[in-house]
Amino acid sequence: MFSDGMYAFIYIENTKLWREDMKECEVLAVIPARSGSKSVVDKNIRLINGKPMIAYSIEHALKAPGIDRVIVSTDSEKYAEIAKKYGAEVPFIRPAEYATDTALDLDVFRHALSYLKENENYMPNIVVQLRPTYPIRKIQDIENMIQYLKEHPEADSVRCIAPAKEIPYKMWFMDEKNILSPIMKDVPECYNMPRQQLPKVYYQNACIDVFRTTVVTEKNSMTGDVIAGYQMDENYDIDTEEDFLKAAEKLKADLEKL
């Protein structure tokens, strides 16, 4: 376990954790899909290998045995119809104030959970966030992350990580006079040390987030205080045209293997 002040970070080996005999709590998957993308217009419903991109995340959620319910949170009636076509529920249309490019994930999930509680008296124990910009992910990774949270009550959430290619121990701030100061100060002169002697660090991707509902409703957070890390090597986040091409090639190659 790594700790940083009040936050603790647990590293999980990428092993098969999920077991079919454990189904004791309600797990909700939420796929947030706003319509106002600026980098690539309507990227969440853009066709990739013949299907809207959001369809892949819906299919991943529906295929995961550990997920009990799948909803899409969107501000678009058009997106809602597409989501329903591929099997997701769309119990509400997200208010415009939670669909801007500055809206926080916390606002989006507080709204979704509040709506479900007030209108359906429904409150899951665990929430899985699957962003639609990741059309490639393994069902087993979703299952492993859910099961880890079920088996470890000390953890508030689980996040995907991968070893960082660029490490903060070799990074700097620079002031207006071009004077450098190191970002990391916990290791003396870390910038002069061989990389192999420095602590191993990870960056987070956003492919899968799993967290307890109470993290949002009681702690006003998307992670809580104890964050477990699940290593995932592949990461196909789509934000540019180049990303689309790479993901399409990967999906096509995977289909050809079947």
Predicted segments, located by residue:
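Short phosphate-binding loop-to-helix
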Residues: 78-128, 137-140, 144, 189
